[in-house]
């Protein structure tokens, strides 16, 4: 079982840790073609699309859980139908985004309220990026399906190749074709469509044998569609809670001062790095728990829960020790601003608590995605999010920015605790 978990987790971790590279390259490119407004436009535009795509991450999660269960039942016709269903819905939503682009981009930029010189550049960036929406959401369906099929290597290969294509295309368009923010955006769009095309090709290469199973009937029957949308509705609402907490965390820091915002952003990077590793084991939990749950093998299912929790504890302890030992030296790798590093000392130990407090939330999220218990996931996240806001507003007058960190640490802990209680009472 340990080997199966690592076989699924490691490729996902490799994919995750390459994600920041793209943002760094985009910023580096525009940093050489204009002033700070270009960098601001890329930051605003990419944040807008990141939030939108994050909200529709249910396409990956819902597909992963249902596919792994169908695989466990050895219902290969349904496995095929799930892919067609997810791809159709993902690409369809992407086309709706394209049709509504003026309204979406206008509202998004209004809500983010960047300075006037940034707004026009960000709008130009977004109007190019929107062409990639069908590819991004279609690839979400493919990625979830591959994970459900116990294959995280194909998503890793697609992700790494996308990154390379994005970098090369952006460099060529900006420095050879003399495009500016549109060049960076078009490089991203080219990479997104390349990723979808590559997923289609790899599917044909590795899963051609599934063509012998008849899947063309009942693809869009009302009952499976109702289940698909019911599951994804709960995951969507859960994601809204996650986005609300994360956006509020940033906004609350900015209201304190620019220095506190910088400190919070720096320390949240420690959480982000930890999450790249834990997401890998969450994906493994999705795939394996769904497969054994679908097969009705409760012994193997409980073993998956036990083993992924053990790996989670190991990763959490490892990162906690790394942060304690590294301390200020670790922060100096992320910034050279001595003022920010010094100010971080007052809040550093809150960030150290994040791995141990957040570990169980990652693992149980993966398990509950795999067994498609979306209502339980929504319940845990809603309770934790409500607690986050209540704690912050009650304690902020007394503790200041410490209240924000205390609320966030307890929010992570509570998500895992609620899911653990549900698992013990209903699933064990």
Regions flagged by a language model, labelled:
Residues 1-9, 67-134, 165, 174-236, ...:
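Short alpha-helical transmembrane segments in multi-pass integral membrane proteins
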Residues 21-40, 109-116, 172-179, 240-273, ...:
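Helix-terminus/linker motif at the lipid-water interface of multi-pass membrane proteins
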Residues 24-28, 141-145, 167-172, 200, ...:
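Alpha-helical transmembrane segments of multipass membrane proteins
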Residues 30-50, 82, 117-121, 181-182, ...:
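Interfacial/gating helices of multi-pass transporter permease domains
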Residues 39-99, 136-155, 263-325, 359-372, ...:
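Small-residue-rich hydrophobic transmembrane alpha-helices
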Residues 60, 128-148, 155-166, 184-200, ...:
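Short runs within selected transmembrane alpha-helices of multi-pass transporters and secretion channels
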